[in-house]
Amino acid sequence: MKKILLTGFVPFLDNPINPTEEIVQGLHKKSVNGWEVVGEVLPVDFHVTGDHLVELIHKVQPSAIISLGLAAGRNRITPERIAINCNDGPVDNQGYKPDGEKIISDGPDGYFSSLPIKKMVKELENNGIPAKISNTAGAYLCNHVMYRALHEIEQQKLDIFSGFIHIPASHKLALTNNIPSFAQKDLQRAIEICIGCLD
């Protein structure tokens, strides 16, 4: 059975939970549409997260990678189109604040997702789940891991589909914030649908 590496993140900033962590834990070792899910929760740390992801790619040897991130405030599932070679944003969980430096000093300006993002959006909408392609993954850890995975695949000429999907807040996370939210089970179902779009 083909393997898919599914990653999420631990809680960060002022978020007490991270629904991507729950999705990854919920799908770990499960079979989804012929794919064996290998789930991994990543730290929110600019200095170690990218290297850890690269190590996982070579250890797991997946045929596909979907990385997940929380975009609290968005009101739909948003597969990302592009990752840019830039670290920026608020502090990570170790207190480090990037200031626009490159992720890879001699790397290209950006990489496009190799996931079937249009198909994913269509299938999500066909299942009654709001979805839209996003043209910016930001410059925080979400963009960082998307870029690092795609860069490693390009440099090593690996035959791996890879990309990133941002999800809205879960209801539990929205209890203390006035933001759009989904039921956790619907967020997980959305990712299962996205996995089902892979050939």
From Swiss-Prot:
It is found in: Cytoplasm. Transmembrane segments: none annotated. Gene3D superfamilies: Peptidase C15, pyroglutamyl peptidase I-like. Keywords: Cytoplasm, Hydrolase, Protease, Thiol protease. It comes from the Bacteria. This is Pyrrolidone-carboxylate peptidase. It is an enzyme of class 3 (hydrolase). One of its GO terms (molecular function) is pyroglutamyl-peptidase activity. Disulfide bonds: none annotated. The keyword Cell membrane does not apply. Belongs to the peptidase C15 family. Its EC number is 3.4.19.3. It comes from Oceanobacillus iheyensis (strain DSM 14371 / CIP 107618 / JCM 11309 / KCTC 3954 / HTE831). Homotetramer. Removes 5-oxoproline from various penultimate amino acid residues except L-proline. GO terms for biological process: proteolysis. It catalyses: Release of an N-terminal pyroglutamyl group from a polypeptide, the second amino acid generally not being Pro. InterPro entries: Peptidase_C15, Peptidase_C15-like, Peptidase_C15-like_sf, PGP-I_bact-type, PGPEP1_Cys_AS, PGPEP1_Glu_AS. One of its GO terms (cellular component) is cytosol. The active site is at 80, 142, 166.
